[in-house]
Amino acid sequence: MAKRDYYEILGVSKSATPEEIKAAFRKLAKEHHPDRNKSADDTLFKEINEAYEVLSDSKKRAQYDQFGHDGPQGFSSASGFSGFSGGFGGVDFDINDIFGSFFNNASSSHNSSNQYETYDIHLRLHLDFMEAVNGISKNINYDRKITCHKCQGTGAKDPKDVKICTKCHGRGTSIENVHSLFGTIQQEVECHECEGTGKVASSKCEQCYGKKVINERVNLTVEIPAGTREGEKLLVSKKGNIVNNQEFDLYLHISVKPSKYFALDGLDIYSETYIDPIKAIVGGIIEVVTINGIKTIEIPSNTPEGKKFRISGSGIVNKKSNIFGKKNGDFYTTIRYAKPVELSKDEIAYLKNISTRTNQNVEYYKNKVLKEISK
């Protein structure tokens, strides 16, 4: 049976941020977990965990986006395994499902940093081409979670109503039996009753309704440095969610709107410059519009259309130049012939006189064609 698409299983788009994927997983995991839903489908619950295990890991997600279920799923060379399916009575499985899910989940229950990663906020920021090139101060608005001031993050109406979780006995984790090809294996996971805190509240705070956090609208000005490029991730420290009085980070994922007139290749910029054909013949100084304004360059006489010229150091700012000593990118422009301006009778007569001269390049090409048709 063909495996379902991981994005479809979690109900998210292929462009979903890590935060959106985490939120979708938590919602589905609670809804379909056997401890909370006695009629839960074990197969669906396994699919949900499998999908999240891949999509929550940037390397595995990239490989899945490229290869799908048939390709590698992000195993490191140290693991000694490569993804495979079949071979045991027609049962499809991935070796990572058997080993990785146990050890990864077990370790995450003891490693609070995995939990805290979910409190970072990821936003997509759209920039115009020149905003990215020159840098800009950008105002952004977004929602974040902060610790409820009324209950101080307990979720309870009264601090006395906060009790030790009876399911995990305050550990924040519980043991589950997982059935595999190798038998039943015990797996330590986050307690679903107290969500890993080890405590539950018998009453609900009147402000946060037991959620322990409240929403806050943030208006923030961020500085986008010159030379910011498509696909970059900018860190804004301590501007994410605030949970248990700990400030988490905001990540801005950059999208740059393409320019109509400039093309990027690394730090280099490419453009086209239109000149009068007469100027191309006689040569001289021409003006080139760059991202830094107008620059002048000198072209030789008889400059052909398509000739490329370079203006050194006039490309994208290299933000790492102070560290590695690398120069900025270069600016390249390709010559294009503009439609000639209207000429006077005397100018036309002068050009007609010149045009009667034999051009060896024209004759050479004509003779090549004649040779072809005379075969």
Swiss-Prot record:
Query: Cellular location of this protein?
Result: Cytoplasm
One annotated Gene Ontology cellular component of this protein: cytoplasm
- Alphabetical list of Gene3D superfamilies matching this protein: DnaJ domain, Heat shock protein DnaJ, cysteine-rich domain, Urease metallochaperone UreE, N-terminal domain
- Per UniProt, Zn(2+) 2 binds at 165, 168, 191, 194
Q: Which UniProt keywords apply?
A: Chaperone, Cytoplasm, DNA replication, Metal-binding, Repeat, Stress response, Zinc, Zinc-finger
**Principal cellular location given in the protein's record:** cytoplasm
Q: How is the cofactor bound?
A: Binds 2 Zn(2+) ions per monomer.
Chain ranges of the J domain: 5-68
Its needed co-factors are: Zn(2+)
Ranges occupied by CXXCXGXG motif repeats = 148-155, 165-172, 191-198, 205-212
Q: Which residues bind Zn(2+) 1?
A: 148, 151, 205, 208
Q: What molecular functions are annotated in GO for this chain?
A: ATP binding; heat shock protein binding; unfolded protein binding; zinc ion binding
Q: Name one GO biological process term.
A: DNA replication
Describe, by residue range, where the zinc fingers (CR-type) fall in the chain: 135-217
Q: Which Pfam families match?
A: DnaJ, DnaJ_C, DnaJ_CXXCXGXG
What the protein does comes down to: Participates actively in the response to hyperosmotic and heat shock by preventing the aggregation of stress-denatured proteins and by disaggregating proteins, also in an autonomous, DnaK-independent fashion. Unfolded proteins bind initially to DnaJ; upon interaction with the DnaJ-bound protein, DnaK hydrolyzes its bound ATP, resulting in the formation of a stable complex. GrpE releases ADP from DnaK; ATP binding to DnaK triggers the release of the substrate protein, thus completing the reaction cycle.
What protein family is recorded? Belongs to the DnaJ family.
In the UniProt entry, what is the domain comment?
Answer: The J domain is necessary and sufficient to stimulate DnaK ATPase activity. Zinc center 1 plays an important role in the autonomous, DnaK-independent chaperone activity of DnaJ. Zinc center 2 is essential for interaction with DnaK and for DnaJ activity.
Q: How does it assemble?
A: Homodimer.
Cited NCBIfam families? DnaJ_bact
Which named protein is this?
Chaperone protein DnaJ
Species: Ureaplasma parvum serovar 3 (strain ATCC 700970)
Which gene holds the coding sequence for this protein? dnaJ
